[in-house]
């Protein structure tokens, strides 16, 4: 008995140590979380922390190098403060990414629920549209739409919202069909609850974790897509500025004033990388098959 009790008491601290290690957030994830939080704070407080107007020009201070006491990140070819434009670009790019991700999630989840509920013809139509969307290069579609209809902020956000909806539709459809076959959803339906109530109140909360992980995958992709469109001149238009817009304008001065292009390029790289790392960490935490 004494040997058994000693061995049991010795095993308890080991288990506790392993549990604490599992609960500890990795350093890389913590750094990614801090970076993304800083980006959100900058986007919210852009009007208060921006030192100059993004359209304010000073031809006497053209192409000032970073480190100047009045222009910490230097100036561009017409004397505009790079830091001020970078802060505004972060706000615009995050606004587009957040809006488009929410639209894509709502659209795909709704369509997926409709396919799971009605099945048959509706399901076949949804799956066909999802296959078509997945096979179509979205950048070419976006370029065609923006070139034909012109570009405005509302149109750009709505167009970006069409990106990746088929991913959410497939996830929502598959998980909704699986959840509907389980006892709790069938029991609520037999009690007389409406299908819309069953999907919103019982099925959606059970698949929310998977949708959140998918959103962390879509968000950086939309940032890169918007940056590509703005780089090509079909995204955000002057006087507004976005990260891709700044990279597009700065490429002409890459050899003489590389800071104009490198500052927004590094923000794009670190932001998309941090969200991808957070997405992988959330997937490991929320996916029951990995636990």
Where in the sequence are the language-model features?
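Transmembrane alpha-helix signature in integral membrane proteins
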Residues: 82-114
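Lipid-exposed faces of alpha-helical membrane segments in multi-pass integral membrane proteins
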Residues: 31-45, 99, 103, 107, ...
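Short helix-to-coil transition segments within interhelical loops
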Residues: 75-80, 117-118, 133, 177, ...
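Glycine-rich helix-loop "coupling/hinge" segments at transmembrane-helix boundaries
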Residues: 145-148, 160, 175-176, 217, ...
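Transmembrane alpha-helical segments of polytopic membrane transport and secretion proteins
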Residues: 1-37, 277-291
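Generic hydrophobic transmembrane alpha-helix motif, especially the helices
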Residues: 72, 82, 108, 116-117, ...
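Hydrophobic alpha-helical transmembrane segments of membrane transport/permease proteins
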Residues: 30, 34, 38, 42-77, ...
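C-terminal transmembrane helix and the adjacent membrane-cytosol boundary/short C-terminal tail
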Residues: 163, 209-217, 258-291
């Amino acid at each position: 008995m004494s040997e058994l009790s000693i061995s049991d008491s010795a095993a308890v601290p080991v288990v506790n140590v392993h549990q604490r290690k599992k609960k500890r957030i990795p350093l890389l994830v913590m750094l990614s979380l801090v970076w993304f939080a800083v980006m959100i704070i900058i986007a919210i407080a852009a009007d208060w922390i921006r030192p100059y107007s993004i359209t304010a020009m000073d031809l006497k201070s053209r192409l000032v190098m970073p480190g100047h006491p009045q222009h910490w990140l230097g100036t561009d070819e017409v004397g505009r403060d790079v830091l001020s434009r970078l802060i505004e670009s972060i706000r615009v790019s995050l606004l587009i990414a957040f809006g488009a991700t929410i639209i894509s999630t709502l659209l795909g989840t709704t369509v997926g629920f409709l396919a799971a509920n009605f099945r048959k013809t509706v399901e076949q139509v949804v799956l066909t549209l999802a296959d078509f969307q997945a096979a179509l290069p979205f950048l070419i579609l976006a370029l065609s739409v923006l070139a034909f209809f012109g570009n405005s902020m509302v149109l750009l956000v709505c167009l970006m919202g069409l990106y990746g909806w088929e991913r959410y539709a497939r996830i929502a459809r598959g998980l909704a069909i699986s959840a509907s076959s389980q006892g709790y959803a069938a029991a609520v339906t037999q009690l007389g609850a409406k299908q819309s109530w069953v999907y919103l109140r019982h099925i959606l909360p059970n698949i929310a974790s998977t949708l959140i992980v998918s959103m962390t995958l879509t968000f950086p992709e939309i940032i890169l897509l918007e940056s590509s469109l703005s780089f090509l001149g079909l995204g955000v238009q002057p006087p507004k500025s976005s990260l891709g817009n700044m990279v597009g304008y700065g490429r002409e001065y890459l050899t003489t004033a590389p800071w104009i292009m490198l500052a927004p390029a590094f923000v794009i790289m670190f932001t998309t990388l941090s969200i991808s790392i957070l997405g992988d960490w959330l997937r490991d935490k929320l996916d029951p098959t990995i636990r």
